[in-house]
Design a protein with these regions (language model features):
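ATP-binding N-terminal substructure of ATP-dependent carboxylate-amine bond-forming enzymes
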Residues: 1-112
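Single conserved hydrophobic/aromatic residue that forms the stacking wall/gate
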Residues: 112-123
Length: 123
């Protein structure tokens, strides 16, 4: 079981993940942008860390900042929620290579989905 999960998302999805973690007795870390510092997910999490500015590319999609947040908070798993990094092969692979659990599909499954979905959709 995980001891601490970093939630790499915001809003309602992050709130739901945090509430589920609390039910299981798992500590949570919320990442946030500079403008989301008063958001509900930040208030509900056990810890929070600002990972960048209001632009998603500078915060919720900023893999180096998120990796730093994982290290600083000593998180042993990451839950991406949906959107943002949930289907990012490189992110999932980096986590796997660093023995950090990714709460989601394996990097291979993410890669396979991105290769086959366009083909299936064009049929």
């Amino acid at each position: 079981m995980f001891k601490k999960i970093l939630i790499a998302n915001r809003g309602e999805v992050a709130v739901r993940i945090i509430r589920a973690c609390k039910e299981w007795g798992i500590s949570t870390v919320a990442i946030h942008s500079d403008v989301d510092k008063e958001s509900m997910h930040v208030k509900l999490a056990d810890e929070s860390l600002c990972v960048g500015s209001h632009q998603p590319s500078d915060s919720y999609l900023n893999i180096p900042s998120i990796l730093s947040a994982i290290e600083v908070t000593n998180s042993d798993a990451v839950h991406p929620g949906y959107g943002f990094l949930s289907e990012n092969y490189n992110f999932a692979k980096i986590l796997k290579d660093n023995n950090i659990k990714f709460v989601g599909p394996s990097p291979d499954a993410v890669s396979y989905t991105h290769l086959t979905l366009p083909t299936i959709c064009s049929v």
